[in-house]
Amino acid sequence: MTLWVDADSCPARVRVLVARAAARLGCVARFVANRPIPLVQSPHCIMVETQPVDQAADRHIIAYARAGDLVVTRDIVLAKAIVDARISVINDRGDVYTEENIRERLSVRNFMYDLRGQGLAPETTSPFGRRDAARFADSLDRETAKLLRLARRREAKTGEEQCDWPSAQGKSQTGRR
């Protein structure tokens, strides 16, 4: 399992929580952004800096995330692409995006975008607080536990364990144990 983070607008507290989860689970967390982002120094955390163009980080995540991974993003359009690829995705407030709720979320996003474009709604984002961090941490724990259970079931069926671990150079290697 790889934890993918759309790091361009990800709160620092969320980055720390993801880094701790990656260390606890022994997996890799890839923070993808089109500019350098400060990270927790850990062999489990990898910064992926894309070209400094719009949507480059999103395209990278879409191209490399796989079933069994978890993506963290607040970008609804990216979340829809990830859900459509049958990959688990949550936002930085702990909301889990699914096939059942992503269309509604995208519709609300588009409606609010239109209202803001017409000057009928202010551009506001509530500050990220302790409750948000706790809710995110709970959601992250639930989703990673679910993904680990699914991976164990697949391993039991195939008899092979797939793992993704960081090498000494900090790059990820995939192999069989």
UniProtKB/Swiss-Prot annotation:
What segment(s) does the record annotate as region Disordered?
155-177
Q: Which Pfam families match?
A: DUF188
Any transmembrane segments, and where?
Answer: none
Q: Which domain of life is it from?
A: Bacteria
Family note: Belongs to the UPF0178 family.
Q: Which PANTHER family match?
A: UPF0178 PROTEIN YAII (PTHR35146:SF1)
HAMAP family hit by this protein = UPF0178
- Put simply, this protein is called UPF0178 protein TP_0845
Source organism of the structure = Treponema pallidum (strain Nichols)
